[in-house]
């Protein structure tokens, strides 16, 4: 096993579940779960209709990159949502080839660190900068890619934003990624 795994801390949602085990919310108040972002509502009817219409395709794996139609639709949505005019990303807008659908944020965040680290570079370990508190996937991805995590405090005093001016030049020089929460 990779010895760097020993540096990982307990997953926050497991720790939170243990801390609140046995706690009973007051009977006169509605319980609001603010832990893991699990859906609490039924899917909209149009989603269920689309899923039912697609059941025949569940017997095979989809293309890793998703369908061209899906990637194109996501690219157009990005352009509308973030007002990305033609030429901002590339002439003609966001190319669908720059879009990669994933099953969840952890998968993509983890894979990103693996993709940007050159394992043949034997200099000082690269750094991955992240706010603290942080999403556990940032830390695990950095360690698994052979990088050193650099934690930037995001406290009430800083408006819960990391102070980017406080990042030392030598850290910036070695940083290969910066996760922003």
Segments predicted by a language model, with ranges:
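Conserved core of the PLP fold type I
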Residues: 59-181
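Conserved N-terminal helix/loop that builds the PLP phosphate-binding region
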Residues: 1-56, 172
């Amino acid at each position: 096993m990779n010895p760097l795994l020993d540096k990982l801390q307990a997953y926050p949602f497991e720790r939170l579940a243990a801390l609140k085990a046995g706690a009973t919310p007051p009977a006169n108040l509605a319980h609001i779960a603010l832990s893991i972002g699990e859906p609490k509502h039924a899917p909209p009817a149009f989603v269920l209709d689309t899923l039912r219409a697609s059941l025949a395709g569940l017997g095979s794996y989809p293309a890793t990159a998703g369908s061209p139609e899906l990637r194109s639709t996501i690219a157009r949505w990005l352009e509308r949502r973030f007002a990305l005019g033609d030429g901002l990303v590339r002439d003609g807008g966001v190319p669908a080839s720059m879009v990669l659908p994933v099953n969840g944020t952890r998968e993509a965040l983890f894979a990103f660190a693996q993709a940007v680290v050159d394992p043949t570079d034997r200099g000082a370990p690269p750094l991955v900068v992240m706010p603290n508190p942080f999403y556990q996937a940032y830390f695990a991805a950095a360690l698994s890619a052979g990088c050193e995590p650099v934690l930037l405090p995001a406290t009430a005093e800083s408006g819960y934003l990391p102070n980017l001016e406080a990042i030392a030049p030598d850290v910036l020089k070695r940083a290969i990624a910066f996760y922003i929460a």
